[in-house]
From Swiss-Prot:
Component of the post-replicative DNA mismatch repair system (MMR). Involved in B cell growth by positively regulating B cell proliferation and controlling replication efficiency. Controls cell cycle to prevent re-replication and defects in DNA damage-induced G2 checkpoint. Doesn't seem to counteract or control the immunoglobulin gene conversion (Ig GC) and to contribute to guanine/uracil mismatch repair. GO terms for biological process: mismatch repair; mitotic G2 DNA damage checkpoint signaling; negative regulation of DNA endoreduplication; positive regulation of B cell proliferation. This is DNA mismatch repair protein Msh6. InterPro entries: DNA_mismatch_repair_MutS-lik_N, DNA_mismatch_repair_MutS/MSH, DNA_mismatch_repair_MutS_C, DNA_mismatch_repair_MutS_clamp, DNA_mismatch_repair_MutS_core, DNA_mismatch_repair_MutS_N, DNA_mismatch_repair_MutS_sf, DNA_mmatch_repair_MutS_con_dom. Transmembrane segments: none annotated.
């Protein structure tokens, strides 16, 4: 904190700056803004004696444009637009000062504590309310600041009143003692604004001549010109020296509060030719509120005493804080014309115009191979640029699709089109100049980059990788240097996209727990004409890769399932390789996903090139299998040819998979995260869930395999709302939300994977159910463990982050290892905090296992017992023994000290290199002491001492009187002082060299200590990851137990029976409820229902595998079908279900054809979507599948729809014989299958009151009860009445329906009679049926 005296000094300096030097400093958070300007105190006594100009009387005239009580937007220099009320000055009784363009209006700023001031009429705009389009994003008055939003609320309230009432809001009546000084400043500002042309000419003097002072301000300090911010001088790269305490030019130019990074402006750089390099003050706009300014001035009502003029030295220091001459350049991003010029400079460049752009290979935009990620920048243009801007264009030309965050000192600068993006998307403001320029501090990078990435932008972080001293040394070592060499090196250290976020130390922490996959896909047809996919996808925050290759059907069913289970946020594909069907999936199902095409060969590598790069780059050197001698991970090795021991030849059915991996590796390499992710060697082979689902496989053998999973494709997950709802895409109302009470992020991710692929093996399912029962049997432990789990951080991501920091590969040649960060200490502290957080997390895991081991012996579940049993105690235990390792890390270094200082000093015995260096230092120092004692005895003088520092240490200082004797010849005179001489010997030089070497080794070990510490921790990664996996499973099991205990209404343990070949599959649910719906729309309790398929119910119904469901519109048919689907998923997940009885044989796949929607982005109509989904069912369904079909055929003509529905029912019921719920409103279909043994009829019951020919008189009460038999009508006119269809239309429709019914019935009677005449049927039943049909006419 600043002392009161320092603050007082700075306040007085501010007054002088404001009244005399026209300096514009931010007033918000004064202490933070001025914390780096304390050096002003050295000359403040000289500054505060500057005479203050006398007040100039104002010419008062009434404009007539505005009147008291008007509401306006007002803008003062350095402040955002602010809602104001115009009212008469409390002492002058007028609203206007001056006349013409120099007139100023008196306003009160709306705020919690209102303030007032005079504002130039040029900077007033009528206030039209907070709903005005100029207030919205992109408008002139748009702001994200809560203060301005609050001010708009007050202004909106004032708008509803008349002017008389509004004037009662004017509460600022006391005149300010410093008001006249403020007015003088505003006069100068207005004069400057009106004379921009003169100032701009002076500013753009390319020869750097002295600035000509204004005649009216002779006392104003003469200054060298400060050039526009589009210039980059060699000195601009000298401003950042983290190890130098004295403020640099960059720091001196930045009087901003970095915590308010949204509106921070970046500093300007002078060009190389400027004779005096004066960095201009970093202007802060849209930050301070007028109220703060006024309150600051009121605190200092007395003006400084008049005294001698300020000295030249003081003036030169004050120029460091000079504001740009024209604040009009800070204008809205969307209108270049409001910035004092027609367009931004980059908008005028011909080679940047649409239609004229070329890529780096000079291919135009209409060329088929045009690369939009690169840009051709003419060489003659680059030669005209300053060194810094030339480097920016070089980087931009290779990353044209990225927003370049260009490090200058401690700020990230955005230039040209990137600056416009920053203003539009981040709310930054432009700097002065004719070209777009904005920026933010280093500390704000994580927050701002996350916003841009979330909006789909690609970010390129460019760091300064050379200090000014290093640059000078490089230039000296180079024979011929140009001005382009005399600039510090800057390199791209990271490219961040939505699919490549790793949440490093400089990035912000993740806000979401779910996986974000980067998917790479390659496609081709095999020799049989079948579609084949090669895929590779990775969650970069965890570092786990999935690689696989599979064949697919014409509907791309497996690929659709993949993207549903592992939803990518970014997709890479080979340009010109994808089929139309795959492109439709990318444009339809993955429309919100970022998609990027890679060029075949150079970017999307072949399988052979991929293997070659993986071996050459030595990504897996640390993980090399010493026994087999294999460098490649086992999963990658399995994809190579068995005949090639080197692993350079792809396997027969693995070329596409390895090529897709190559696309991923290329992209990770481009984003500069290939080393940290691939060196984890965390690969898993992707095998489609339905890979072995074949109709010829014995059902008992199939379900006996523990690795079998239920297949839930993307359509089913969407229709049943398992992961996200169909309304807004969130988890609200989904099965995931209902059962997810996981406490850890990695547990939540695992639960989602379990939901996407429930178990099929009854033994495994029952073991999970046993685990749920075991946990429910120890409620006290359940509560205790829950509290422990809540303390765990996201250890899965932390382990990946620790590996990245400790990676030797990254430390050797990654640009980030050379980057110079201003906030290095802050980042070091964050690294240590993350590491200590991981250690604490594993300690908590140990406590969890200790607590569970006390009751583990009573557990029936094998999986639960294995999770909480240590390997060392039982051979079946899975949890690693971490106690010894954790104790080792507890004593490795002082945790509290490291957390405070950001520096790790290892304790003895932990770091061999550091310990050896310390031991050598100690040994040499002891040798020095021994040698000194020896020399004392030799000379007979006890007063001989060592003297010196650094490399001149250990000079023996001998009294001059003693040197007159014969000294040994080996003594070499090094220095003298009065009465003494100092000597070295060869022995001393040798020992000193040893000491310096040991000290250098110690310092190097200490400097690299954190990385090596993380690296050593990562060596035990297998145990750490195993522990995380065990606790993740425990967390999910506890989540299932919580639902099983706290679910609404009665819940039961499902009974899963292994199917018998002689018996049909069945599903039996008694009094079952929808798991996500506890109340009806009207607030009543949910009505439970029985669903029996494939077995007889209590009423003795048939064992039909297909149930035809009818009932009134809105009667609950779709809900019943969704309920059945969700309950079987829960049962095979290993969770209790909301029912009194749940018995079933395992279901291998759930199919759904629910709802009605088109795929407009894929060019598919509603009916086509229906038939596509139905086709997939008919192709892939087995007798062990569950099929849910809702109103098939409604998307086409009635007869066509009826025919298709009838054929599908017959196929499902008589051929496939799978468990089916088929809802329909085609009552002819019901009649056709009423006598079929393979089909059972059921309907949602309803009660009809006042049934009559007039539908308006009927009252339908939905009972939501599923009962045996068919429903006679669909009562569609009741739904029409509930939807407020006009009564007249309903009546007409009812009459028309009667006509259709009669015609249809007549036709059916005619056909029946024809059959009787032909002798096809003529029994008593036929006669009875004919009689019934006639009664309906």
């Amino acid at each position: 904190m600043m002392s009161a005296s320092n603050l007082s000094v700075i306040h007085e300096v501010l007054l002088v700056l404001l009244n005399h030097q026209r300096i514009n400093l931010p007033y918000e958070n004064l202490e933070a803004s001025l914390s780096r300007m304390l050096f002003l105190s050295s000359f403040v006594q000289e500054v505060v004696q500057v005479p203050i100009p006398c007040n100039v009387s104002a010419n008062r005239s009434v404009s007539g444009v505005y009147s008291p009580g008007d509401l306006v937007w007002a803008k003062m220099e350095g402040y955002p637009w602010w809602p104001c009320l115009i009212y008469n000055h409390p002492t002058e009784g007028t609203i206007v000062r001056g006349k013409g363009s120099s007139a100023r209006i008196h306003v009160q700023f709306f705020d919690v504590s209102p303030t007032r001031g005079w504002v130039s009429i040029k900077y007033l705009r009528p206030y039209k309310g907070s709903s005005d389009r100029e207030v919205l994003k992109g408008g002139m008055f748009y702001s994200m600041k809560p203060e301005i939003k609050k001010a708009m609320e007050l202004a909106d309230d004032a708008m509803s009143k008349d002017k008389t009432k509004r004037l009662e809001l004017a509460v600022c009546s006391e005149p300010s003692d410093t008001e006249e000084a403020e007015e003088e400043e505003m006069e100068q500002m207005s004069g400057s604004a009106s004379g921009d042309s003169d100032d701009s000419n002076s500013e753009e003097d390319v020869k750097g001549n002295k600035r000509v002072p204004n005649r009216g301000s002779a006392i104003k300090a003469k200054r060298r010109r400060v050039l526009d911010s589009d210039s980059d001088r060699d000195g601009s790269d000298v401003e950042f020296k983290p190890d130098v305490k004295e403020a640099s030019s960059e720091e001196a130019s930045s009087g901003v509060d970095e915590n308010e990074a949204t509106d921070v402006e970046t500093d300007e750089e002078s060009i190389e030719e400027s004779p005096i390099k004066v960095p201009s003050k970093r202007k802060r706009g849209n930050v301070s509120k007028p109220s703060k300014r006024s309150s600051l001035e009121n605190e200092h009502s007395e003006a400084p005493k008049r005294a001698a003029p300020v000295s030249l030295e003081a003036k030169s220091k004050l120029t460091l804080f000079a504001a740009p001459e024209n604040f009009e350049s800070q204008a809205n991003a969307c209108s270049g014309g409001t910035n004092g010029f027609a367009a931004w400079e980059h908008e005028k460049l011909e080679w940047l115009q649409e239609g004229k752009k070329k890529d780096a290979h000079r291919r135009r935009q209409n060329h088929p191979d045009y690369d939009p990620c690169t840009l051709y920048v003419p060489e003659d243009y680059l030669n005209k640029c300053t060194p810094g801007m030339r480097r920016w264009w070089q980087l931009k030309s290779q990353n044209f699709d990225a927003v370049i965050c260009y490090k200058v000192g401690k700020f990230y600068e955005l230039y040209h089109m990137d600056a416009v993006t920053g203003v539009n998307e981040l709310g930054l403001i432009f700097m002065k100049g004719s070209w777009a320029h904005s920026g933010f501090p280093e500390t704000a990078f994580g927050r701002f980059s996350a916003i841009l990435v979330q909006k789909g932008y690609k970010i390129a972080r460019v760091e300064q990788t050379e200090t000014p001293e290093m640059m000078e040394a490089r230039c000296k070592a180079t024979a011929h240097t140009t001005k382009f060499d005399k600039v510090v090196r800057r390199e791209i250290c990271r490219i961040i996209t939505k699919g490549t976020q790793t949440y490093s130390i400089i990035d912000c922490d993740p806000t979401e727990n779910h996986n974000k996959y980067l998917l790479c896909v390659k496609e081709k047809e095999d020799s049989s004409g079948q579609r084949v996919y090669g895929v590779c996808f990775v969650d970069t925050s965890v570092g786990k890769f999935y690689v696989g290759q599979f064949s697919d059907d014409r509907h791309c069913s497996r690929f659709r399932t993949l993207v549903a289970h592992y939803t990518p946020v970014q997709v890479l594909f080979e340009k010109g390789n994808l089929t139309v069907d795959t492109q439709k999936i990318l444009k339809g199902s993955l429309i919100s996903c970022i998609q990027e095409g890679l060029i075949s060969g150079s970017q999307f590598w072949s399988a052979s090139k991929t293997l070659k790069v993986l071996l050459e780059e030595e990504y897996f050197k640390e993980n090399q299998n010493t026994e087999s001698g294999c460098v490649l991970p086992s999963v990658i090795k399995s994809l190579t040819s068995e005949s090639d021991s080197l692993g350079l030849t792809p396997g027969e059915n693995s070329e596409l998979a390895l090529s897709a991996l190559g696309g991923i590796v290329f992209y990770l390499k481009k984003c500069l995260i290939d080393q940290e992710l691939l060196s984890l060697a965390n690969f898993e082979k992707y095998i489609p869930v339905d890979a072995d689902n074949a109709k010829t496989v014995s059902s008992s053998n199939f379900f006996a395999r523990t690795d079998r999973r239920m297949v839930l494709d993307g359509v089913t997950l969407m229709n049943l709302e398992v992961l996200q709802n169909g309304t807004n895409g969130t988890t609200e109302g989904t099965l995931l939300e209902r059962i997810d009470s996981c406490c850890t992020p990695f547990g939540k991710r695992l639960l989602k994977q379990w939901l996407c692929a429930p178990l099929c093996n009854p033994t495994s399912i029952n073991d999970r159910l046993d685990a749920v029962e075991d946990l429910l049997a120890v409620p006290a432990k359940l509560t205790e463990i829950t509290e422990h789990l809540k303390k765990l951080p996201d250890l899965e991501r932390l382990l990946s982050k620790i590996h990245s920091i400790g990676s030797p590969l990254k430390s050797q040649n990654h640009p980030d290892s050379r980057a110079i960060f201003y906030e290095e200490i802050k980042y070091s502290k964050k690294k240590i905090a993350d590491f200590l957080s991981a250690l604490e997390g594993f300690k908590v895991m140990n406590e969890i296992v200790d607590a569970m081991e006390e009751v583990a012996s009573d557990f029936k579940s094998q999986v639960l017992k294995q999770l909480v049993t240590r390997k060392a105690k039982h051979p079946d235990g899975r949890f690693p023994d971490l106690s010894a390792e954790l104790k080792r890390w507890d004593t490795a270094f002082d945790h509290n000290q490291a957390r405070k200082t950001g520096v790790i000093t290892p304790k003895a015995g932990f770091d061999p290199d550091y310990d050896k260096a310390l031991q050598d230092i100690k040994t040499v120092e002891e040798d020095f002491r021994t040698y000194l004692d020896k020399q004392r005895k030799l000379l007979g003088l006890k007063s001989v001492l060592y003297w010196g520092t650094g490399k001149n240490r250990y000079q023996m200082e001998i009294p001059e009187t003693a040197t007159s004797r014969n000294l040994p010849e080996e003594y070499e005179l090094k220095s003298t002082r009065k009465g003494y001489k100092r000597y070295w010997t060869k022995e001393i030089e040798k020992m000193l060299a040893e000491l310096i070497n040991a000290e250098e080794r110690r310092d190097a070990a200490l400097k690299d200590c954190m990385r090596r510490l993380f690296y050593n921790f990562d060596k035990n990664s297998q145990d750490w990851q195993t522990a995380v996996q065990c606790i993740a499973v425990l967390d999910v099991l506890m989540s299932l137990a919580n639902y099983s205990q706290d679910g609404d209404g009665p819940l039961c343990r499902p009974v899963i029976l292994l199917p018998v070949d002689s018996a049909p599959p069945f599903l039996e649910l008694k009094n079952a409820r929808h798991p996500c719906i506890t109340k009806t729309f009207f607030g009543d309790d949910f009505i439970p229902n029985d669903i029996v398929i494939g077995s007889k119910d209590e009423d003795g119904g048939s064992e039909a595998s297909c149930v035809l469901v009818t009932g009134p519109n809105m009667g609950g048919k779709s809900t019943l079908m969704r309920q059945a689907g969700l309950l079987v998923i829960m049962a095979q997940l290993g969770c209790y279900v909301p029912a009194e009885v749940c018995r079933l044989t395992p279901i291998d796949r759930v199919f759904t054809r629910l709802g009605a929607s088109d795929r407009i982005m894929s060019g598919e109509s509603t009916f086509f979507v229906e038939l596509s989904e139905t086709s997939s069912i008919l192709q892939h369904a087995t007798e062990h599948s569950l099929v849910l079909v809702d109103e098939l055929g409604r998307g086409t003509a009635t007869f066509d729809g009826t025919a298709i529905a009838s054929a599908v029912v017959r196929e499902l019921a008589e051929n496939i014989k799978c468990r089916t719920l088929f809802s329909t409103h085609y009552h002819s279909l019901v009649e056709d299958y009423s006598g079929s043994a393979a089909v059972r009829l059921g309907h949602m019951a309803c009660m009809v009151e006042n049934e009559s020919e007039d539908p308006s008189q009927e009252t339908i009460t939905f009972l939501y009860k599923f009962i045996e038999g068919a429903c006679p009508k669909s009562y569609g006119f009741n739904a029409a009445r509930l939807a407020d269809i006009p009564e007249e239309i309903i009546q007409k429709g009812h009459r028309k329906a009667k006509e259709f019914e009669k015609k249809t019935m007549s036709l059916r009677i005619f056909r029946f009679l024809c059959r009787v005449v032909d002798g096809v049927t003529h029994d008593a039943n036929a006669v009875g049926k004919l009689t019934t049909m006639l009664s309906h006419l």
